[in-house]
Amino acid sequence: MQVNDLGFVASILFVLVPTVFLLILYIQTASRQGGKDS
């Protein structure tokens, strides 16, 4: 059970952390381009 729980948490962090990082970069890039142009 402990190995499965650790693996489950590790999998979530492994997917969640890069996703949040990419979302932040995407939001910063989108905000820099300016929404008024589109």
UniProtKB/Swiss-Prot annotation:
GO-annotated cellular components: photosystem II; plasma membrane-derived thylakoid membrane
GO biological process: photosynthesis, light reaction
Coarse class of the protein's main subcellular location: membrane
Pfam families: PsbM (PF05151)
Entry-linked InterPro entries: PSII_PsbM, PSII_PsbM_sf
Coiled-coil segments on the chain, per record: none
Transmembrane segments: 7-27
Keyword hit for Transmembrane helix: yes
Signal peptide: none
Keyword Transmembrane assigned: yes
Superkingdom assignment: Bacteria
Entry keywords, A to Z: Membrane, Photosynthesis, Photosystem II, Reaction center, Thylakoid, Transmembrane, Transmembrane helix
Location in or out of the cell: Cellular thylakoid membrane
Bilayer topology: Single-pass membrane protein
Function noted in UniProt: One of the components of the core complex of photosystem II (PSII). PSII is a light-driven water:plastoquinone oxidoreductase that uses light energy to abstract electrons from H(2)O, generating O(2) and a proton gradient subsequently used for ATP formation. It consists of a core antenna complex that captures photons, and an electron transfer chain that converts photonic excitation into a charge separation. This subunit is found at the monomer-monomer interface.
PANTHER family to which the protein is assigned, alphabetical: PHOTOSYSTEM II REACTION CENTER PROTEIN M
Complexes and interactors: PSII is composed of 1 copy each of membrane proteins PsbA, PsbB, PsbC, PsbD, PsbE, PsbF, PsbH, PsbI, PsbJ, PsbK, PsbL, PsbM, PsbT, PsbX, PsbY, PsbZ, Psb30/Ycf12, peripheral proteins PsbO, CyanoQ (PsbQ), PsbU, PsbV and a large number of cofactors. It forms dimeric complexes.
Family: Belongs to the PsbM family.
The protein's name: Photosystem II reaction center protein M
